[in-house]
Amino acid sequence: MPDVLPREGIRLGLSADNRWDAVRQCGAVLEELGAVEEGYARTMLEREQSISTYVGEGVAIPHGTDASRALVRRTTLAVLQFPIGVSWDGERVTTCVAIAAKGDEHVAVLSSLAQILLEPDQAEKLRSSSDPNEIHHLLQSISKDIQE
């Protein structure tokens, strides 16, 4: 099984005008990775309009609607870091963990991500690391949980 979080899906030092721009960028990376069909980014925006994907600690998890699963070629994560931050319903998001899931894998992502965010040192690394390898290593537990 291919890596759920490919290293080329980790993008650091980005900027976004607003949360909608950040979500569009997330969708574009998933499409660039070949994980989703064209149109998936639009469903990510639809999801965000219906309910915020902000999960706390400066992290959001943009993902598509349930109906968009037909557009997912393979379950994949991408990490986009916005060091300056993006306003997200009054919160400041510095990291987006974009999710393309064929099934209910997003539940495992949430569970594993929650464990990382509960550890202040790990949460800080996720938000501020300038090393893609460090981010990849930090999030390997999520990949393993999804692949099990």
Model region roles, listed by residue range:
Residues 1-148:
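Cytosolic covalent-transfer regions centered on His/Cys nucleophiles
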